[in-house]
Amino acid sequence: MANKKIRIRLKAYKHRTLDTAAAKIVESATRTGAQVAGPIPLPTERSLYTIIRATHKYKDSREQFEMRTHKRLIDIVNPTQKTVDALMKLDLPSGVNVEIKL
């Protein structure tokens, strides 16, 4: 797999679980001898939802809820077959969305 690059994009609602998952990926990739760039923090996506508290009237009484999606990017340069096998066997915490591009 010479001159290849693996780009891993992580998403999660909780930044601590995201950071532990990124640390596990970086640690397993460096242990197998690949060069790692990252984790690079990407902009946090913020969704704001406004809901009327009452069921029928009282439109002035509203409540706002916020959902933040934290993102990280990891590039693995020149991965070996050991690196790919280690990434496939890696156990990541639940709640982390992983997208891998070769």
UniProtKB/Swiss-Prot annotation:
The lineage's top-level taxon is Bacteria
Instruction: Offer one example of a GO biological process linked to this entry.
Output: translation
* UniProt xrefs under InterPro entries: Ribosomal_uS10, Ribosomal_uS10_CS, Ribosomal_uS10_dom, Ribosomal_uS10_dom_sf
GO MF terms listed in the record are: structural constituent of ribosome; tRNA binding
One GO cellular component term of this record is:
ribosome
Question: Keyword annotations for this protein?
Answer: Ribonucleoprotein, Ribosomal protein
Instruction: Report the SMART domains cross-referenced here.
Output: Ribosomal_S10 (SM01403)
Does Ribonucleoprotein show up as a keyword for this record? yes
Quaternary structure, per UniProt, is:
Part of the 30S ribosomal subunit.
Family affiliation: Belongs to the universal ribosomal protein uS10 family.
Functional summary from the UniProt entry: Involved in the binding of tRNA to the ribosomes.
Q: Which PANTHER family does UniProt cross-reference here?
A: 30S RIBOSOMAL PROTEIN S10 FAMILY MEMBER
Mind telling me what this protein is named?
Small ribosomal subunit protein uS10
Question: Which organism is this protein's natural source?
Answer: Streptococcus pneumoniae (strain Taiwan19F-14)
Its taxonomic placement starts with: Bacteria, Bacillati, Bacillota, Bacilli, Lactobacillales
